[in-house]
C-alpha cells in the first residue's frame, strides 16, 4: 500500500470519528449526545453562555446572557433594625438565643424581597432532516481553544458541527459542514420557558428573533428586556421563512449561524438601554470570514488560558470518554484527568467572568431555568468568594475584575445596610444579586450574617499582595476603610470575657449542639467572624501605612483588634467554631467556617501557629470528607494548607464522584465536569482548581513554598505559570520521584524572594545558604501575626508532624529570572 493511500485512510478515519482526538489532552469528549442539561457542554465569553447538547437530529443551544435577572433596581434593607438590635443582643448575652432568633426575622430581615433570580434566555433548536440513524458519533469540548465539536456519520455522509462563543465578536458562532454537497437541511426556531411578555418573530433581515422580559419576583417588577437574534448564512441551497417564528435551510453545502443577545441593562441602577439595538450592534460582526473569526477567538481566549500548564503524565485512561473516566477515577490512576479538571476550572472562569462584565454567580453564567437553584445569586458566605480563589494564583487576574467591581458597587449600596444598624461604613449580608442588594434575606436561619464585607475586602488586599500595585491599592483602600468603620461602630462587648464581638451573627448555615440539641443559629462572636474582622483590621492597617493614612485611625484599629476574641482550642482538641465549647465531634456539616483562618485566610500555619494548626486538623478530620461538591472543593484547599497532599488528593477523588442527582447532599461531578452540590453549583469547580494549585505552590505564609502538599500519586510532573504573592511568577517547576528538580521564578517587581522547600537548593549552580525563619524584608511576603489562642485545660495537644524544610532568601531585580535546582546544574 502506498504512503499516499495510508495518509488518505488516516484522514478519513479522523473525519469519521474512528480516531478520536486523544492527541489533545485538554478535551472533554463523549461517544453519545447529551440527554440531560448536566451532560451538555458549556461555552461562554463572559457575556453570553451556551450549553451544547450535540444531538445529530435535534441540536439544542441553551442560551444565557449575564444580565438577564428578575426584578429591577432596588435595595432590601429593613428600617426596623435600629430599634431591635439592642434587644436582640441582650437576649443573646442572656442565653436566650431562640428568642433572639425569633425577633431577628421580622425586625432585621428584609420585608420586601430576598434577592432576584438569574434567568435563562431560551433555547435555539436546529431540527435536521433525514438523520434518523447515525454512526461514529463523537463530541468534545476543547478547553485549549474554547470550541465545541460534534461529529457523526449518517447515510454515508460525515457531518461536523463547530460552535464557539467568540470573545472578540461577543457572538455565538456555529458552523455546519458535511462531506457531501447539498446535504444540510434543517429548520431553526427558538423556545423559552417564559409564559408572558415574549415574542417570536422573523426580523426584517430574515433572522430568528426572540424578544422577552425577565420576571417580576417577590413584588419587584421585572424590567430587564432582552432580544436574541439568529442570523443564518447558507452556502448553497436555500433559506426561507416557513412560519412567523421558523427558518428553513434546504440542501446547503455548509451553514454558519450567528447568535446575538442584547439587553437593556446599563448598570445596577440603570436599565434604560435598548435590547434590540444592543443585539444589532453585536450582530455587526457576523458574516465575516469564518476562519479568521475562529482564529481571532482562539487567540483572544488563549492569551489567558495558555499562561498556565500542568503535566502530571498520562496513561490509557485518556482513550476513554470523559464520563467514563469520572466513573473510574477513584479506582484507577488517571493523573491526566486531575490536570484536565484543574484546567477546566480555569476554562470556566475565563468563560464566565470577563473584564467589564458581571461576576460569575452560583451557576457561573449557565442556567436553563427561570429560577436558578438558590436563584443563582451571589451567595457571600463562601460561594461567590470561592469562585475567585483561583483567579490570582492561576494567572487569571483580569477575570477577578468583575468580582472586584461587584465589591465596589456593593460598598455603595451597603451604606444603607450599615445605616440600618446606626453604623458608619458599609456592609451586606449573606447574599447579593445584580442589583447589589445588601439586606438580610432568607430568614434568621441564613440572613443573620453581616460579616461578609470583611471577606470581600480580603480579595481586595490579596490582589495587592500578588501585584504590589499601589495605584490599585489607593483605589480600593477607601472600601477597606469603610468596612473597618462599620466594625468600629458595630462590635459590641460580650459580658463574659469583655471581648469585642460581632453580634448578632452565626457560623454560616450551621447550628451549635447545646446539651445534645440544636435549636438556634443566632449567636455572638463566632470564630469565623473573629478571624475575618481581625484579618480586615490587620490588612487595612498595612494598607493605611502604605497610603500614609493618619495614625489615629490605624491606632484605633489596633486597639480594637487587641480586644477581639482570640481563637480557642476546645475540649477534644478541636478549633472551636463558637465562643462556647459547643462543637460536636459527630457534626459533619458541609460548612467548615471556623477554618477560614486556615484557608482562604492565613492565620493558621504549621510554622507560625502549630497548636492552631493541629486543632484545625482535628476539626477537619472530624467533619469528614464526602459532602456537597463545593464543600469538598474547599476541603482540598484546607488539606493542602495542612500540608497533607495525600488527603487533599483523596478529596479530589471524592469530588470526582459521578452523579446525575439534582438535589441532596451527595456531592460529586456531573458528566460534563460541572460540580454537583447537587444541583449544579460552579463554585466547587473553582475551589478544586484553587486547591490543586495550593498542592504545588503556596505563598500565604511568609514564603513561596514549593511542593508543600504533593501527593504520592503525582510522583513526577511539570507546572508552569503559577503566580505567587510578592509579584513572583513560577515560570516552570519540574519534579521527579516526589522531589523538586528545578524551578524557574521571574521577579516582576523586584524585592526579596523567600523560598521554602523540602530540599537544599542551588541558584544558577551555586549552593544557597539557608536563613532563619524570622520574617523576610519583603512586605508582600509576610505571615499574618495573630493573638495568642486560648486552650481548654483538658484539651489534648499534639505537635505537628511535617517534613523538614529549608528557607532561602534571594535578592531579586525587576524582570529577572532565577533558576533553582536541587543539585548543581552541571550534574
Language-model segments: which ranges?
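Bacterial Sec-dependent N-terminal signal peptides
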Residues: 1-23
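Aromatic- and carboxylate-enriched substrate-binding clefts and catalytic-loop regions
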Residues: 464, 488, 493, 503-518, ...
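C-terminal catalytic domain of Rieske-type non-heme iron oxygenases
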Residues: 363-364, 368, 500-502, 510, ...
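Feature representing long, continuous alpha-helical segments
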Residues: 454-458, 478, 598, 614, ...
Amino acid at each position: 500500500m502506498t504512503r499516499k493511500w495510508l495518509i488518505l485512510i488516516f484522514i478519513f478515519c479522523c473525519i469519521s470519528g474512528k480516531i478520536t482526538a486523544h492527541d489533545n489532552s485538554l478535551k472533554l469528549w463523549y461517544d453519545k449526545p447529551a440527554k440531560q442539561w448536566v451532560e451538555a457542554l458549556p461555552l461562554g465569553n463572559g457575556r453570553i453562555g451556551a450549553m451544547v447538547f450535540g444531538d445529530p437530529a435535534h441540536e439544542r443551544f441553551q442560551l444565557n446572557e449575564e444580565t438577564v435577572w428578575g426584578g429591577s433596581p432596588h435595595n432590601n434593607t429593613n428600617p426596623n433594625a435600629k430599634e431591635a438590635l439592642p434587644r436582640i443582643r441582650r437576649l443573646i448575652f442572656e442565653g436566650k438565643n431562640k428568642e433572639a432568633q425569633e425577633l431577628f426575622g421580622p425586625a432585621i430581615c428584609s420585608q420586601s424581597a430576598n434577592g432576584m433570580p438569574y434567568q435563562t434566555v431560551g433555547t435555539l433548536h436546529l431540527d435536521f432532516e433525514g438523520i434518523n440513524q447515525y454512526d461514529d458519533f463523537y463530541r468534545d469540548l476543547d478547553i485549549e481553544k474554547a470550541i465545541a465539536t460534534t461529529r457523526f456519520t449518517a447515510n454515508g455522509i460525515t457531518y461536523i458541527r463547530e460552535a464557539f462563543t467568540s470573545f472578540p465578536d461577543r457572538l455565538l458562532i456555529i458552523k455546519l459542514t458535511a462531506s457531501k454537497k447539498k446535504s444540510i437541511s434543517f429548520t431553526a426556531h427558538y423556545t423559552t420557558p417564559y409564559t408572558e411578555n415574549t415574542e417570536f418573530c422573523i426580523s426584517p433581515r430574515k433572522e430568528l428573533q426572540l424578544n422577552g422580559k425577565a420576571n417580576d419576583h417577590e413584588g419587584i417588577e421585572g424590567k430587564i428586556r432582552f432580544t436574541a437574534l439568529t442570523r443564518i448564512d447558507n452556502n448553497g441551497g436555500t433559506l426561507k421563512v416557513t412560519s412567523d417564528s421558523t427558518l428553513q435551510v434546504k440542501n446547503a453545502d455548509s451553514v454558519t449561524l450567528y447568535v446575538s443577545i442584547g439587553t437593556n441593562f446599563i448598570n445596577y441602577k440603570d436599565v434604560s438601554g435598548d435590547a434590540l439595538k444592543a443585539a444589532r450592534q453585536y450582530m455587526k460582526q457576523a458574516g465575516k470570514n469564518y476562519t479568521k473569526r475562529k482564529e481571532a477567538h482562539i487567540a483572544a481566549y488563549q492569551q489567558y488560558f495558555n499562561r498556565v500548564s500542568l503535566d502530571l503524565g498520562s496513561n490509557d485512561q485518556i482513550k476513554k470518554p470523559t464520563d467514563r473516566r469520572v466513573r473510574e477515577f477513584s479506582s484507577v490512576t488517571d493523573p491526566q484527568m486531575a490536570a484536565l479538571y484543574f484546567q477546566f476550572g480555569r476554562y470556566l472562569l475565563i468563560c464566565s467572568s470577563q473584564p467589564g462584565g458581571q461576576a460569575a454567580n452560583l451557576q457561573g453564567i449557565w442556567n436553563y431555568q427561570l429560577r436558578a437553584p438558590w436563584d443563582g445569586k451571589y451567595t457571600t458566605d463562601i460561594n461567590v468568594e470561592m469562585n475567585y480563589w483561583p483567579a490570582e494564583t492561576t494567572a487569571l487576574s483580569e477575570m477577578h475584575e468583575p468580582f472586584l467591581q461587584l465589591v465596589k458597587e456593593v460598598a455603595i449600596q451597603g451604606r444603607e445596610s450599615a445605616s440600618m444598624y446606626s453604623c458608619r461604613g458599609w456592609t451586606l449580608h449573606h447574599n447579593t444579586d445584580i442589583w447589589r442588594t445588601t439586606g438580610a434575606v432568607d430568614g434568621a436561619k441564613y440572613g443573620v450574617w453581616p460579616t461578609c464585607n470583611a471577606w470581600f475586602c480580603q480579595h481586595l488586599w490579596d490582589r495587592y499582595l500578588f501585584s504590589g500595585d499601589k495605584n490599585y491599592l489607593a483605589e480600593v483602600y477607601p472600601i477597606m476603610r469603610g468596612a473597618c468603620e462599620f466594625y468600629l461602630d458595630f462590635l459590641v462587648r460580650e459580658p463574659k470575657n469583655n471581648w469585642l464581638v460581632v453580634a448578632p451573627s452565626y457560623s454560616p448555615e450551621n447550628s451549635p449542639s447545646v446539651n445534645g440539641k440544636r435549636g438556634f443559629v443566632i449567636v455572638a462572636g463566632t470564630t469565623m467572624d473573629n478571624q475575618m474582622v481581625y484579618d480586615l483590621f490587620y490588612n487595612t492597617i498595612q494598607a493605611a501605612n502604605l497610603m500614609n493614612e493618619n495614625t489615629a485611625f490605624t491606632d484605633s484599629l489596633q486597639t480594637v483588634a487587641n480586644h477581639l476574641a482570640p481563637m480557642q482550642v476546645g475540649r477534644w482538641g478541636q478549633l472551636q467554631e463558637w465562643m462556647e465549647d459547643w462543637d460536636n465531634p459527630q457534626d459533619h456539616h458541609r460548612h467548615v467556617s471556623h477554618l477560614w483562618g486556615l484557608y482562604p485566610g492565613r492565620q493558621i500555619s504549621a510554622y507560625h501557629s502549630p497548636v492552631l494548626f493541629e486543632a484545625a486538623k482535628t476539626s477537619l478530620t472530624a467533619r469528614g470528607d464526602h459532602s456537597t461538591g463545593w464543600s469538598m472543593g474547599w476541603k482540598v484547599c484546607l488539606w493542602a494548607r495542612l500540608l497533607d497532599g495525600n488527603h487533599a488528593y483523596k478529596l479530589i477523588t471524592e469530588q470526582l464522584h459521578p452523579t446525575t442527582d439534582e438535589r441532596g447532599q451527595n456531592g460529586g461531578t456531573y458528566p460534563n465536569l460541572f460540580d454537583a452540590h447537587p444541583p449544579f453549583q460552579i463554585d466547587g469547580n473553582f475551589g478544586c482548581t484553587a486547591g490543586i494549585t495550593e498542592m504545588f505552590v503556596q505563598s500565604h505564609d511568609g514564603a513561596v513554598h514549593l511542593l508543600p502538599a504533593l501527593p504520592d500519586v503525582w510522583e513526577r510532573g511539570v507546572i508552569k505559570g503559577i503566580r505567587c504573592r510578592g509579584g513572583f511568577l513560577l515560570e516552570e517547576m519540574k519534579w521527579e520521584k516526589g522531589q523538586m528538580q528545578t524551578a524557574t521564578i521571574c521577579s516582576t517587581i523586584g524585592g526579596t524572594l523567600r523560598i521554602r522547600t523540602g530540599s537544599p537548593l542551588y541558584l544558577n549552580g551555586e549552593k544557597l545558604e539557608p536563613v532563619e525563619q524570622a520574617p523576610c524584608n519583603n512586605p508582600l511576603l509576610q505571615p499574618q501575626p495573630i493573638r495568642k489562642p486560648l486552650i481548654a485545660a483538658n484539651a489534648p495537644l499534639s505537635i505537628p508532624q511535617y517534613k523538614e524544610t529549608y528557607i532561602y532568601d534571594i535578592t531579586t531585580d525587576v524582570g529577572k529570572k532565577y533558576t533553582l535546582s536541587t543539585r548543581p546544574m552541571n550534574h
